[in-house]
Structure formats: C-alpha cells, structure tokens
Amino acid sequence: MWQLLLPLALGLGTMGLGRAELTTAQHRGLQVALEEFHKHPPVLWAFQVTSVDNAADTLFPAGQFVRLEFKLQQTSCRKKDWRKEDCKVKPNGRKRKCLACIKLDSKDQVLGRMVHCPIQTQVQRELDDAQDAQCSRVERAGEDPHSYYLPGQFAFIKALSP
C-alpha cells in the first residue's frame, strides 16, 4: 500500500500550493490579480488558475503586501464570464505564468497592484528584473519612506559634524 501512496504524495507535492492553502490575504490578492488580468483588452477568453507556485504575504504599517506566482490556462468561456464555475480549461489552450504583487490596507482596499502574465513561451530573464522592480514599488505603496532606515544612511551626516 505504501508503494502506491508514496508516488501520489510526491506528485501532489510538486504541483505547488493548493488554493485551500492560501491565507485570506493571499486569496484576496489572487482575486484582485484575476480581476486585473481579465480587464485587459487583448484578453478575449477567460483564464483559470491551474496552480499557485509561490505565495507570500508581509505585514507593513500601511497594510499587507501579497506576492503570488501562479499559472493560468485558457478556458472555453469568453472573458466576461471568467467567474463562472462551469468554464472548462481547454486542453490545448494558451498558458500564462503570472507574477502578481498586491498591497492591501486594513480594510482590504487595494493600495497598489502589479499583475504581469506573459504567454509562457515569452517569459524572458530581462523581464524578471523589471517585474521585481515594479513589485518592490507596490510593496512600498502607502508606506512612510522615512519609517525605516538603511545601514549607513546617516554615516555621512555624523562624519561631517565637528
């Protein structure tokens, strides 16, 4: 029996996080990301989340920052119907690998967002650096820029004092 369960457990472990394993903030971030994705004019078909590969949230004074990496696949529904439960994933439909960075305040209002979902074959290394920079800007949304200090930030001021 164990010989049958071990491959199943290993297979499920490599599939990424399930939607049930996401925190409340991560669920809200995923919802905001899907809404944002389906707003874009080039998107004609509804897409469905096939896996969540990475999910992290960080609490800041201005709110909660959520970073999600997930995969989408095209369904048989038009984009206006993306919320419908009966939309089936097309076996040969387009696939997208997404990075979403969402900043939520204490009332679940969106302070900042960045959603990037290129077609999976178009993912390039240069874009990853630009996405990380955009994600960092979203992470700092609503924060006081003077609430934290970097090492050595005041070293020159003290050195110039008599």
UniProtKB/Swiss-Prot annotation:
Biological processes per GO annotation: cell differentiation; chemotaxis; inflammatory response; innate immune response; positive regulation of chemotaxis; positive regulation of fat cell differentiation; positive regulation of protein phosphorylation; regulation of insulin receptor signaling pathway
Signal peptide feature range: 1-20
Localisation: Secreted
InterPro entries registered for this protein in UniProt: Chemerin (IPR029562), Cystatin_sf (IPR046350)
A single GO cellular-component term on record: extracellular space
Positions in coiled-coil regions: none
Keywords: Chemotaxis, Differentiation, Disulfide bond, Inflammatory response, Secreted, Signal
Bridged cysteine pairs (disulfide): 77-87, 98-117, 101-135
Post-translational modification summary for this protein: Secreted in an inactive precursor form, prochemerin, which is proteolytically processed by a variety of extracellular proteases to generate forms with differing levels of bioactivity. For example, the removal of five amino acids results in chemerin-157, which exhibits the highest activity, while removal of six amino acids results in chemerin-156 which has slightly less activity. Some proteases are able to cleave at more than one site and chemerin forms may be sequentially processed by different enzymes to modulate activity levels.
GO terms for MF: signaling receptor binding
Positions of the propeptide segment: 156-162
Protein function: Adipocyte-secreted protein (adipokine) that regulates adipogenesis, metabolism and inflammation through activation of the chemokine-like receptor 1 (CMKLR1). Also acts as a ligand for CMKLR2. Can also bind to C-C chemokine receptor-like 2 (CCRL2), but with a lower affinity than it does to CMKLR1 or CMKLR2. Positively regulates adipocyte differentiation, modulates the expression of adipocyte genes involved in lipid and glucose metabolism and might play a role in angiogenesis, a process essential for the expansion of white adipose tissue.
Name this protein carries in UniProt: Retinoic acid receptor responder protein 2
Originating gene: RARRES2
